[in-house]
């Protein structure tokens, strides 16, 4: 799922949001393709009402959750298993206010075909 576009209006109200709860994502993500992740928040800015909660992401060929220039999203109580590349990934390191709480990631594998960060996803 890709979430993109402008996320706030001039009145400071969020116009784009994504809410995933109790969803199973299986055999997702396109291997060896940057930007093709199961859940990808892409340059949305502030998204304080958005979340990924109590979901299962497994057998992913390209990461699990990816935040790119997106702020204030809650990632909570998710289980991620058998993932290639970074499981919970903040792409630029400028993302702020995102909450990662009570998540589990098991069997996260390296992927030399993505970014250097995906070679050692536990670092």
Language-model-derived ranges and their functions:
Residues 38-44, 48-54, 59, 67, ...:
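Extracellular beta-sheet-rich ligand-binding/adhesion modules
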Residues 10, 62-65, 90:
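A general structural-boundary detector
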Residues 25-50, 86, 90-123:
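Acidic/polar low-complexity surface segments
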């Amino acid at each position: 799922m890709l979430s993109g576009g402008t996320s706030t209006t001039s009145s400071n109200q969020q116009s784009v949001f994504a809410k995933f709860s109790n969803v199973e994502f299986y055999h997702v993500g396109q291997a060896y393709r940057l930007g093709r992740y199961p859940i990808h928040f892409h340059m949305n800015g502030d998204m304080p009402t958005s979340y990924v909660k109590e979901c299962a992401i497994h057998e992913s060929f390209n990461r699990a959750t990816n935040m790119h220039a997106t702020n204030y999203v809650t990632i909570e109580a998710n289980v991620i298993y058998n993932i290639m590349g970074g499981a919970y990934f903040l792409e630029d390191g400028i993302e702020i206010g995102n909450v990662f709480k009570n998540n589990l990631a098991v069997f996260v594998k390296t992927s030399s075909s993505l970014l250097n960060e995906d070679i050692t996803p536990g670092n």
